[in-house]
Amino acid sequence: MNLILMGLPGAGKGTQAEQIVAKYNIPHISTGDMFRAAMKAETEMGLQAKSFIDKGALVPDEVTIGIVRERLSQEDCVRGFLLDGFPRTVAQASALEEIMKDLGKKIDYVLNINVDSGLLLKRLTGRRICKECGATYHLEFNAPAKADVCDKCGGELYQRSDDNEETVANRLDVNIKQTKPLLDFYEELGYLQSINGEQDINKVFADIDVLIGGLA
């Protein structure tokens, strides 16, 4: 099963990725991990990426796409994979189609975890972190026993500056605009599957499981 996982910040992608790879024993391939592994292994594309990163420059698409090709050609991807964080643009998605064709494979589903932006705002702005031990809480979903006090060490809880409402709303807005052309591209190809991410975590996975179970 060859899957792409999409969703806005706060949609719960990480949690669902963990459950998918645990049940179906396929590699979870995130962009960051892919780059780190390629640079560590000193592959041709990894060395090229490192030369750009060391200069503080953006890694060009052709290098990123080369790293994706290297990674998807590895033995652990024979039974499938879960791609997370790539592609980000229609150009990258088109390049991925070419890679899959060359490898004699196809993308089975693009799973988009769908959550209303108002609910995402609530999820993302409710996070609080302990100044002393770094424990993470959420005002609605995982509140401390005593307001603004860490259950573990009694430290003061604070909101990170990039978790404030205006910053989060801007971040979501940018993500929505960037993601829409990609979702349209995959809908046209017939790969896109919308998953209701507003449900309980286990129910979200149950819906994904029903969808992809037949691919195993």
UniProtKB/Swiss-Prot annotation:
Pathway: Purine metabolism; AMP biosynthesis via salvage pathway; AMP from ADP: step 1/1. It catalyses: AMP + ATP = 2 ADP. This is Adenylate kinase. Belongs to the adenylate kinase family. It comes from Bacillus anthracis. The keyword Zinc applies. Keywords: ATP-binding, Cytoplasm, Kinase, Metal-binding, Nucleotide biosynthesis, Nucleotide-binding, Transferase, Zinc. Its EC number is 2.7.4.3. Residues 126-163 are annotated as: LID.
